């Protein structure tokens, strides 16, 4: 069946399926049945709907043929009325925990379509998705409903998938057609699905706890990929473009639930913003919702300020393309329920903050200092002004602060360099009032618009896209030379939540023309703080240092001053072509605080200092900015991470503890422009205040300098907020009462005084010739200081003893000594060059792959020892890793030692995320002031060897007891982008103590590592330049022939993902792609939670660049399921895989003992005498009852079972034999297996060597059972005896189940099917015995142990009532013996029904006639038949056709419950 094609279903199968009335009349035991009648229908859609009188005059060019979901009345004749606001969206489906959703679906369109939910419990015939899952054709009728046909989908909302404790009342998901994700979405087939907590919905389906709820879908429709193609790209909200979304209505003091969906068939991000409002999302206060295409979020908002407010995505291209609408808040007379009454003490803490800010035009130098280490190409492209480029200096407008309303005295005589281009920091806590007196000293209108606070229209300072000129008030656009006062109060609804940082990072900017104003430079950082977060001076109480880092992309081509800059800085202004791609690119400046390159100055912090970083992304950027912190981790939203993702026009607050000495790098992870422009170095230094100036301790100069290696200059500074604060009189009194003004009288804090300690530091600094260093040693400025680095176990020693500085054993020893009982884990890893095939199983089995799929790459490979001669062969647990390097596992407080050998042809290294390491083990090169001795780790030459030593601090591991392991990554850091695209990346798992065994494997955990990556071979070191895409191809957007969306480097067909139903499965998901590589992971049929955040339910997981996510899943549905990205174009091109969930009872005898496996299916390398392979059946009896062989030297005997189909093997039972009191048995053996009989795999399991040796028998009679974990899928199994007693001897049974699942016994043999549920046409009864129907149980013992009818004719039948609709996949039959009479059924047929009245025969697919099954050939053996297609029924009858002597039946049915 083609992936997106609809295979014709044979008529007999369709009749059989339609005859399964259980689907039609299926009764659901649910809290509530919620029924919907949905149709897919054609509709002409206008993205810019005009008023009726205008639409008659002209036909819009933006009318497109779409397929949309619409809701109908009972008979599908009348469409239900719908809200105009919903636009293209299908009806919102909703259900509470315990409910069942029944969707009656009819396809009125011209294409096969389906309905697939992102989150619900469903079975295979309600999935609505087409892929090779091993199900029968009739089970795929839901996959693609043909035009004119109908189908009924049944979805259950169970507690396992419902919102968790910390979730909002309703979680937002999408449903859509999954026949062809790209074309179906772009055609319009999508709607919202709300999964709600029990008791959260009213009778009409509306939420109880909100005044209003709205669903908004921010989407990009590519009409060229619609089923009805028409080239156009539309940026919309609910399908409305250019502000034509009907106004969203609300009343003041409403509590609104927002359900926001992002959708696009290509990678897309959205920064959803509601002007003048704040929202709460996942218990965090936000002003911008970060949304990813393919994912959804739920947020809530309490509104109080009346007016019409802009709703938009702040991604520049979205706003410019018309992705906006309006929220209209009216005064409906509702009482104020949002403002909390304050106590007297709280009222006294209220402050008034007054700022005097001007917009000024300046000449800005993006790179006042250009270090020699700056990339040459980057410098030529962005910083030099030859080739008629502007260069690094531009005329810009900036915000600057003044002392008073005269605007004559700036607060800083010299603007702080570390502040860069940023405006002054505006801080306020809840209930404080902020007044900004703004003077426009520039030459054109500007304003101030602040994110993160609720403001009135007078204080908004923003011009909307649809504002006519006459509506642009003074506050929206302050003319040159004019002054305007913005004033607002931080409301209770703006206050950071309990989970938030003390102060949360926001943004302010001019918004007369947001894009051009920001491009011109008018940006600044406000902070909104909790009630007690700020001192009276505006300093945050719970942080040693606050640091602002704004990652801004200034597109100077959109600046108001472009013409001025061309005239001033271009050598030949008249010849400049502004649309020249090279010229345009040279004017897009990637900066950190306005600096487009690294600087010679280094920011400095004290060892153990807690730094509160306020990180923001601003500017003309349509991609995520991943911020990487080397040597340390951010603590953000309760999670430690060393890459923090910033969405456009949004900010994050993160705490960093300075716990790793050295000079480190804060930079953007991603493109060349980002990594070169958005970067700064900082120094984590040890400064011992207690020892400073201690005259009693004399130190030799040599001792002082031994601890200092080429330190940078130091100016250490604690920032004060220059602001006029005007407390209320009562607040003033309280401040004095609390001693808040005492700092002014503290002589140690005075600028004019200089202590002897200061003088000593100045002396040392002058001796060392130190340069400037930004930090925070003192409360005020100290112009120079020295770094008196105290003795430290992992920083001081190596700098004193150069011989041990790079010795891995010495470094590891120091780590081990710092904490008792530390463990050292050693790995041997090499970089090797290989030919990698992105289609390893064969191109014929996949689609959408380019013609060339094999490329030279470099990969990490594990070895057994430091000789690097014997690779560590991967086993079943490593099968799924694909291109990934070996998993490096460790526990908290361990020391990891990796001996790295570079067997490739170019330099590579090892760089680890999340761990603690010295500079000599960083594996990454930048100007960190380290001596050459500490740079040997940066790049290991071909054939070179280096040992990296990493420490595992507690922050690297799980944060709570529910989290087992936490994932990170390692890769080569010589050139991270090119090295990773070349293939050099692997996972790191840090686990709780006691979770890892001596072989570095986790104990009793089912875990998988998945790396989502679009590999671009043109970015690989090994890609021939001659084969790269041409400029023309890139400009017209031709999909690269050399990109491969894949999971672990394998498109479509990643192997080895198998698990048991209801077991805890841990998935570690990695994304180390560039800023545009955004993936949304969806596991069909399952939901999951993020490790450490089990209070939040997830249906899909956005996986952002640099993200390492560990999630936990408890698979609830057996079968083969699809794992994919929700980004349609990547999914279609290969970013998908299958995972198999098998029943926990998958340990059934496969048929050696019962005889289901025939003699011809058993073979061996040889045998001795009459001990033939066919005798190797568990519990076989007789004189010759086993397989045996005499092992000769240099021979390796084996016995093989051909199962004639691929099955799941989970265990092996073995016996020896006894003959004439002589025991013969196998003591030890290993197993090999194959799917085709040609390619054999040795089972390795958890063994550290090449194969697992199973413990065999200890005598000739006892059965020894061995568990196969992980389970294997194979057709052929071989057992290889290695140790034995007397001779290698086997009697065997294999344990397992069918690959497709749904093959467990239904209860005839076990008694789960009750006697009363087994009936027959008649039964034989004599004076001494009764052969009643309930005796028809497989393997039943006794004198009367089967069913016999009263008479033997073709009208007899045996019937089983399964009590509910059941999927029956196979049957085993058995005869019986009475006295010496052998009785069995030789042929039979099957009938079934759901109502016990209308019976239907099981048909032969080939003939469409009643199928006659071959029965038994003796009275005790088993015969098994599979039903393909399976039977869906409650009642089943076995009708004997022919028999031996008399009719006698013992049976077992196999299958599973349907719902």
Curated annotation (Swiss-Prot):
Residues 772-817 form a propeptide. One of its GO terms (molecular function) is copper ion binding. Residues 32-330, 351-685, 823-1142 form the F5/8 type A domain. Residues 32-196, 206-330, 351-529, 539-685, 823-991, 1000-1142 form the Plastocyanin-like domain. Ca(2+) 1 binds at residues 124, 139, 142-143. One of its GO terms (biological process) is venom-mediated blood coagulation. Residues 1146-1297, 1302-1456 form the F5/8 type C domain. Glycans are attached at residues 156, 242, 300, 385, 406, 471, 557, 943, 1000, 1179, 1396. Residues 740-759 are annotated as: Disordered. It is found in: Secreted. Expressed by the venom gland. It comes from the Eukaryota. Residues 1-30 form the signal peptide. One of its GO terms (cellular component) is extracellular region. Ca(2+) 2 binds at residues 919, 934, 937-938. The record marks 771-772, 817-818 as: Cleavage. Residues 693-817 are annotated as: B. In physiological conditions, blood coagulation factor V and factor Va are inactivated by activated protein C (APC) through proteolytic degradation of the heavy chain. However, oscutarin-C non-catalytic subunit (factor V-like protein) retains its full activity even at high concentration of APC. This has two explanations: this protein has only one of the three cleavage sites present in factor V that are targeted by the APC for inactivation, and the binding with the catalytic subunit protect the cleavage site from inactivation. Snake prothrombin activator that attacks the hemostatic system of prey. This non-catalytic subunit is functionally similar to blood coagulation factor V. It serves as a critical cofactor for the prothrombinase activity of the catalytic subunit, which is similar to the blood coagulation factor X. Heterodimer of a light and a heavy chains; non-disulfide-linked. The interaction between the two chains is calcium-dependent. Found in its active form associated with oscutarin-C catalytic subunit (AC Q58L96). In contrast to blood coagulation factors that circulate as inactive zymogen in plasma, venom prothrombin activators are always found in the active form in the venom. Hence, catalytic and non-catalytic subunits are found naturally in venom as stable complexes. This is Venom prothrombin activator oscutarin-C non-catalytic subunit. It comes from Oxyuranus scutellatus. The lineage of its organism: Eukaryota, Metazoa, Chordata, Craniata, Vertebrata.
